[in-house]
A protein has these predicted regions:
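PP2C/PPM-type serine/threonine phosphatase catalytic domain
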Residues: 1-310
Length: 310
C-alpha cells in the first residue's frame, strides 16, 4: 500500500490531495492486478506536486497476465515524467502507446508470454485537475456529494450491447460474457483508433476519485462503494473496499486506488471580523449615548446664556 498527500491552492479554499492504493489476491492464488499511487516529477517529497494513480489487471485465463500488468504500469511510470508540455491528455496517450508496444514486444520475445495483455486505467492529478486515461474494463468512479458516477466506459462486448440498447445495465451485470474484452494493452502492436479514452475532471472540495479492478466492482453495489469512499482517509477507504469485496466472495483479484480532495478552509473577506471588532473599537450604542448627553449639555448652555427660565 502507498499513501501520499499534498496541498494545492484554489481561489477560496485549500485542497489537500491524499491518495492511497490497495491490492489483494483475494479470490485467486496469485495477484495479476498491480496498482500505484505516487508523486511524479522532480519537486518536493520526491514529486513535482503531481500524482499518478494506476490500476492494471492482467488478462485472466491468458499466459503471464501478471507480467503484462507489471510491464504496462512500469512503462507508464517511466514515460510520463519524460513527456514535456501542459497537455496531460496527450502525454497519457503517448505513454499508453509506449506501454502497449512494450508489452507486445515482450510477448513476442518470450514464447511463454505470447498473447499476454492487461487493462490499464490511470489518472494524472495536477493541482485540482484530474486527467484519466483508460483501456479495458478496470474503472474510474467519481463520488461528488452522494452521487457516484462511473467515469470510464468498459471496453467489453456486453458494454457495447448496453450502449446500443440491446440489453439493460442490470442484465449486463449477470451476463456470462461480461468479462470478454474488446480492447486491452499488449495484444496488438498498436492501440486501435483513438485509444486510450481520455476524460478530464475538475476536482471540488470533498470529491473522491476511485480506480478499481473488476474483482471489486463486480461484487459491490454503488451504495457500498459510496459508504467506503465517504471515509476521510483514502487509505481506510481503499482497505475497506478491498475487504468488502473479499467478504462478498469475489473470485478475482481486488484492487482500489483512492484520491481524496479534502477541503481545508482559509479566511476570506466574508469570514474576517469587522475592523471595529479587530481593533477593539467602541460599540455603536455607546457612541449614541455620548452624542445624546452632549446635545443635552449644549441645550443647557444655550438656556443659561440667553437667560431664559428653565
Amino acid at each position: 500500500m502507498s499513501a501520499l498527500s499534498r496541498v494545492v491552492d484554489t481561489p477560496e479554499e485549500t485542497l489537500r490531495l491524499a491518495v492511497s492504493a490497495v491490492t489483494d489476491a483475494a479470490g485467486r492464488d496469485e495477484n495479476q492486478d498491480v496498482a500505484a499511487a505516487l508523486a511524479i516529477g522532480g519537486g518536493p517529497s520526491g514529486g513535482g506536486g503531481d500524482f499518478l494513480l494506476v490500476v492494471a489487471d492482467g488478462m485472466g485465463g491468458h499466459p503471464a497476465g501478471d507480467v503484462a500488468s507489471q510491464i504496462a504500469m512500469n512503462t507508464l511510470m517511466d514515460a510520463l515524467p519524460a513527456l514535456p508540455g501542459d497537455d496531460l491528455g496527450l502525454a497519457l496517450k503517448q505513454a499508453y502507446r509506449r506501454a502497449n508496444e512494450t508489452v507486445f514486444r515482450a510477448g513476442e520475445e518470450e514464447p511463454s508470454h505470447a498473447g499476454m495483455g492487461t487493462t490499464l486505467t490511470s489518472a494524472l492529478l495536477h493541482g485540482k485537475y484530474a486527467t484519466i486515461a483508460h483501456v479495458g474494463d478496470s474503472r474510474a468512479y467519481l463520488l461528488r456529494g452522494e452521487v457516484l458516477t462511473q467515469v470510464t466506459r468498459d471496453h467489453t462486448f456486453v458494454a457495447e450491447e448496453v450502449a446500443q440498447g440491446r440489453i439493460t445495465a442490470e442484465a449486463a451485470r449477470r451476463d456470462p460474457r461480461r468479462n470478454r474484452l474488446t480492447h486491452v494493452i499488449g495484444t496488438n502492436p498498436r492501440l486501435e483508433g483513438k485509444l486510450p479514452d481520455i476524460f478530464e475532471l475538475t476536482l471540488l472540495p470533498g470529491d473522491r476519485l476511485l480506480l478499481c479492478s473488476d474483482g471489486l466492482y463486480d461484487v459491490l453495489d454503488d451504495s457500498e462503494m459510496r459508504r467506503a469512499l465517504g471515509e476521510q482517509d483514502p487509505g481506510a477507504a481503499a482497505r475497506q473496499l478491498v475487504e468488502a469485496a473479499k467478504e462478498r466472495g469475489t473470485r478475482d483479484n481486488a484492487t482500489a486506488v483512492v484520491a481524496a480532495a479534502i477541503p481545508t478552509r482559509v479566511p476570506t473577506a466574508a469570514t474576517l471580523p469587522s475592523p471595529a471588532s479587530r481593533t477593539g473599537g467602541v460599540p455603536g450604542t455607546v457612541i449614541a449615548v455620548v452624542i445624546a448627553i452632549l446635545l443635552v449639555v449644549l441645550l443647557l448652555l444655550a438656556v443659561v446664556v440667553l437667560g431664559a427660565p428653565l
